[in-house]
Amino acid sequence: DIVLTQSPASLAVSLGQRATISCRASKSVSTSGYSYMHWYQQKPGQPPKLLIYLASSLESGVPARFSGSGSGTDFTLNIQPVEEEDAAIYYCQHSRELPLTFGAGTKLELK
């Protein structure tokens, strides 16, 4: 199985600043020109919401302050500027092969 390691486990960011979350895969999730890494946001009592797919593509309806980058084994989610509604847990997930696996999550809090 591909193991996804997220860092940091939690972070506190002031309104208007940048939040950066990293995800490292135990082996490459990129092939044929695509990176099969995705980012989700989850708030209490709600299902995960897809933010970014294929490493850098913004899901429809997601604000442009969310962006993703990376390839191979190293990926990043950036949120800038952070808004109050962004307080949540963020997960990376790969779909390179079965089983699909998620990172352990990063909790974003507002200062």
Swiss-Prot record:
State the GO CC annotations: immunoglobulin complex
Q: Annotated region Complementarity-determining-1: where? A: 24-38
Tell me the GO BP annotations in alphabetical order: adaptive immune response; immune response
User: Which stretches of sequence are listed as region Framework-4?
Assistant: 102-111
Residue span of region Framework-3: 61-92
Location of region: Framework-1: 1-23
In residue numbers, the region (Complementarity-determining-3) covers 93-101
> Could you tell me which Pfam families the record lists for this protein?
V-set
**Cystine bridges: which residues?**
23-92
Database matches in PROSITE patterns: IG_LIKE
Instruction: Give the keywords, sorted.
Output: Adaptive immunity, Disulfide bond, Immunity, Immunoglobulin
InterPro entries, alphabetically? Ig-like_dom (IPR007110), Ig-like_dom_sf (IPR036179), Ig-like_fold (IPR013783), Ig_sub (IPR003599), Ig_V-set (IPR013106), IgV_Light_Chain (IPR050150)
Cross-referenced SUPFAM superfamilies: Immunoglobulin
Where are the residues of the annotated region Framework-2?
39-53
Ranges for the region named Complementarity-determining-2 are: 54-60
Q: What else is known?
A: The PC 4285 and PC 4039 sequences are identical.
Q: What is this protein called?
A: Ig kappa chain V-III region PC 2485/PC 4039
Q: What is the lineage of its organism?
A: Eukaryota, Metazoa, Chordata, Craniata, Vertebrata
